[in-house]
Amino acid sequence: ADQPLTITFKAAKSSDLYGYKGDVYLHIGIVNEEAWLFVPAEWNENIDKCKMTSEGNNCWSISLSPSIREWFASGETPVNELGIVIRNEDGTKKGTDTDFYIKVTDNKYQMFQPAPIKEKAMPAGTREGINVNADYSVTFAFYDKDKNGKHKDFAHIVGDFNDWTPANDETSQMYRDNANGCWWITLTGLDSDKEYRFQYYTGMRDGEIIRIADAYSEKILDPDNDKYIPESVYPSSERVYPEGGRGIVSAFKINQEPYSWRNEFSLKDKDNLIIYELLLRDFTETSDISGALGKLDYLKSLGVNAIELMPVQEFDGNDSWGYNPCFYFALDKAYGTKNMYKRFIDECHARGLAVIFDVVYNHATGSMPFAKLYWNRTDNKTAENNPWFNVDAPHPYSVFHDFNHESELVRSFVKRNLEFLLDEYHIDGFRFDLTKGLTQRECTEATVADYDAGRIRILKEYYDVVASVKPEAVVILEHFCCDEEEKELAGYGMKLWRDANNAYCQSGMGWKEYSDFSCLYTGTNSMKYGGYVGFMESHDVERVAYKALTYGNGAIAKNLSVRMSQLAVNAAFCFTVPGPKMIWQFGELGYDVTRGTEDNKMEKKPLHWEYYTEPERKGLYDVYARLLNLRVTHKDLFQNDAIFSWNVTENYWSTTPRSLTLKNGAEVMYVVGNFGDKETGPLLLPDGIKYDYMTGRELEGTVSVPAHGLLLATSFQP
């Protein structure tokens, strides 16, 4: 560390810098507990100090002199390792795909030297995470046995209670309980009303040292992202980052602020759910829970009976769909405080609205403590010996880092998280993201949907936990696998997403090709009644109204009134089909902003609440509301014993329009949809049909349905 160092880089033919003629810069820092310290320049900052000298022949060099320590001006900080990236002027080209590291000997300043391991069994009843004991002491425990049964050489806790400094004493050094694979420590004398922040300091004596937050934390603090959260969403006084922390830290308080639940709620009919899929970020101007609270009466008036929140467990950054989770027991501060989430759920229950959490157990980001514990920093992915994660996903659809659900460690974690969310937040069920990926079978796009007994076993195990805590809770899977597998899961009690977007986009645009709706009904392939959660739109597919506006046939694209009428016909042939249904937010107003491409689909979308004041769009909303109200006021038509039939293939369109009939006892409903641009001929009404449900007028004999028009006729008065 007190000698000069010359770094020479020669670009291989495979390097982005091979043949490069511009300036090349060194991005470098002293690596200490994962952090890069004393970095001379930001990534996009070019300074002479870091400019490398071209030696010709694809070779560059730079000298750190008069010594490494002096070049960095690092003072008394130990210098044991350097992290290095070679880049061009704007950082778009790198010398190597991965960062590389140089070990350095420092004979002057030493890192903290952990004492030998102290072995001791954990107190009875201790679980991984933060355990508040009856005497107000707190026991901390984390598991670290790798896939080969080995563990870290040491573990200490650092935090507000010991000035963030590891020490070989009872305030910091953790005991080893090898039988349970855990490090643990009990701290006493803590202030029960004070919030404490902490991390685990762990590693190998001759290798990497890391600091991690607790994977079971119910609150974390993020130095890179919390500062951008508005004061109105999460008070800055409750997210003060500690001076001694590095990276994400855990936070806890013995006496947490209680929430007094005011409303008892139980989900009564899982087979008749009308779910509103909602992304808090894009739902109101404030992009938070408070904003959504102000719209609950709007949703109640619409007629939905459940809200499915897109992922709200802590995710990387603040601006996201949420499918990049990192901490599963903490809800993301970008939307509000813990008690604000509870209030939102409580207020939903007060209005008879169930709350479903969209949860992501297929993968996690590299910020997740389990990923960080055993990490391959050269390849920037989880290491071979990581007991929770696969190095690479065995299936073709994964992102970030793929959980191995055949691992008992993973399944125990997921089950505990499901129990926690149900108990702590009183939610009414889950939508599991990408359950097709919960497999260890090596597969391709062509084979991933094949019957997989292992995947089924895992999902049944998770379902059993949910049912044991709250039997009435719903479990919905984004699965998209073969019928045999989906039927087995539905038979066990779960529900499967049923994507009919393409067909309803086609009909919404006025094109009959590929517009067959048959897949939406469980009776089409003998699926268990209520087994499908059918939808025209979800967060992940294109908006029907956008396609109608952009690619609509004739007047559909050119005339707003015609377009909204066509979408109303669409809605009638979705929401009158028995079984659970889902609406993507603002579909009821004909939201016609594109989802975007695969590259930009997750970007924030513009709000158009003014649509509600436009007569044509308000008309569509009113049709939705009437259809959904029908499901409430005449529930018998939507039960398993009702007689259902429909004609919705490409053979039925305009001259011979599409139709749907539901009958249970004396109640009959008859729906006719004219998706074409010409009025139908006279249509003979079925026996018993007397009223136009949408207008209240009496009917008899025959009726004609106008172009882009809808008839919903019933045997009973509206």
Model regions: which residues?
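Short, well-ordered beta-strand segments enriched in hydrophobic/aromatic residues
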Residues: 5-11, 667-674
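Aromatic-rich carbohydrate-binding modules that target alpha-glucans
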Residues: 18-76, 89-100, 141-193, 203-225
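Active-site clefts of carbohydrate-active enzymes
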Residues: 399, 434-448, 531-560
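Substrate-binding/active-site clefts of carbohydrate-active enzymes
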Residues: 220-221, 257-273, 279-427, 434-451, ...
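Contiguous beta-strand segments within globular domains
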Residues: 1-11, 132-139
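Tight coil/turn sites that cap or link beta-strands
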Residues: 193, 706-710
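Basic K/R-rich, polyanion-interacting modules in nucleoproteins and related proteins
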Residues: 109-155, 211-271
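Active-site-proximal helices and loops of the catalytic beta/alpha 8
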Residues: 313, 321-324, 351, 434-535, ...
